[in-house]
């Protein structure tokens, strides 16, 4: 039985959690959404300062919630890549300090590997191989999960990530930040077939389309042109219908690629991770399509779809059980491929 305290500060959530194997003992998430709303997005310098102000209290809360002493903690982990460099440094430095102070092993964890492991928090018996659909504000990828630390990217977005597209369309419609939840809410009362929008296929040099890669920039532009035309005609914007049509288009595009990828590679399980995994439209499309194709789809609990430290701790537990630890000199990286996860360990 391995107990890990993990810290996640890659973007705008200050999160600390303690996990025993795949059981969450405590999970603290201090969101900065209200801080960044006035700017319409995350401001890196503001995020770093907010992490500094919150991190010590979050660690204390996590320890209190778990009702554990430091003697019961086996290792300390923190997200080290990818993410905002200043934000990552706050969490990584705090984790290293705790590891040195309490003489514990230290592990750096890849943020996207954490999102893969979020599914394990509700499905502790899940075993590779399976297909991971990672959909967040910064990443949209189809990942072949072979085992802990071994990942192969099979498809990705060529431009905007799914979550980024939601934020940009919400900004275009003057709905505020973050865009995902508000578009999802509006879409509940809208007509998803009101407007035909492009799914964003990626052409191949020899003709045809890439089966697993996608693009959301064209979809975003199509919504912009739709809004401009409606305003030019003097029509009021049917926000619910636009939201529903946009959300359905994103969900259909992601679902088609995920299903095709799983079937082509003989994988019977699709595990979805990242903030967009909370989207009701995506969940409905994937559940229907997987059932029709005799596949299984798994989602993390809603509270573990967005950034959290429990998923980071869960990944660290698996690495530690394999004898993996990180050097205390490990730094942060704004970009790091999932295929390079093992460079974090010694």
From Swiss-Prot:
PROSITE patterns: GLYCOPROTEASE (PS01016). This is tRNA N6-adenosine threonylcarbamoyltransferase. Binds 1 Fe(2+) ion per subunit. GO terms for biological process: tRNA threonylcarbamoyladenosine modification. NCBIfam families: gcp_kae1 (TIGR00329), T6A_TsaD_YgjD (TIGR03723). Its main location: cytoplasm. InterPro entries: ATPase_NBD (IPR043129), Gcp-like_dom (IPR000905), KAE1/TsaD (IPR017861), Peptidase_M22_CS (IPR017860), TsaD (IPR022450). The keyword Metal-binding applies. GO terms for molecular function: iron ion binding; N(6)-L-threonylcarbamoyladenine synthase activity. It holds the Pfam family TsaD.
């Amino acid at each position: 039985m391995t107990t890990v305290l993990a810290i996640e500060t890659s973007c705008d959530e200050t999160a600390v959690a303690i996990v025993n194997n795949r059981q969450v003992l405590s999970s603290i998430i201090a969101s900065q959404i209200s801080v960044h709303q006035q700017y319409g997005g995350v401001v890196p310098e503001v995020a770093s300062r907010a992490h500094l102000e919150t991190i010590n209290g979050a660690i204390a809360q996590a320890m209190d919630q778990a009702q554990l002493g430091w003697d019961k903690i086996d290792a300390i982990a923190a997200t080290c890549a990818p993410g905002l460099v200043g934000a990552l440094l706050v969490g990584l430095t705090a984790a290293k300090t705790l590891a040195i102070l309490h003489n514990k092993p230290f592990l750096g964890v890849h943020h996207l590997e954490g999102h893969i492991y979020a599914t394990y928090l509700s499905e502790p018996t899940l075993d590779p191989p399976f297909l991971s659909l990672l959909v967040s504000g910064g990443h949209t990828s189809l990942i072949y999960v072979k085992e802990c630390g071994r990942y192969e990217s099979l498809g990705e977005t060529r431009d905007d990530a799914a979550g980024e597209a939601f934020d940009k369309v919400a900004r275009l419609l003057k709905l505020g930040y973050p865009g995902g939840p508000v578009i999802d809410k509006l879409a509940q009362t809208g007509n998803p077939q009101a407007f035909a929008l492009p799914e964003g296929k990626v052409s191949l040099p020899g003709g045809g389309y890439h089966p697993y890669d996608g693009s959301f920039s064209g979809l975003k532009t199509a919504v912009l042109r739709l809004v401009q035309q409606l305003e030019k005609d003097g029509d009021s914007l049917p926000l619910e219908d636009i939201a529903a049509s946009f959300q359905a288009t994103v969900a259909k595009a992601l679902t088609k690629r995920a299903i095709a990828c799983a079937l082509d590679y003989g994988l019977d399980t699709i595990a979805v991770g990242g903030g967009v995994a909370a989207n009701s439209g995506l969940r409905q499309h994937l559940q229907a399509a997987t059932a029709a194709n005799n596949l299984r789809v798994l989602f993390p609990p809603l509270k573990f779809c967005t950034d959290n430290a429990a998923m980071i701790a869960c990944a660290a537990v698996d690495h530690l059980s394999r004898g993996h630890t990180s050097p205390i000199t490990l730094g942060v990286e704004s970009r790091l491929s999932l295929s390079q996860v093992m460079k974090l360990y010694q």
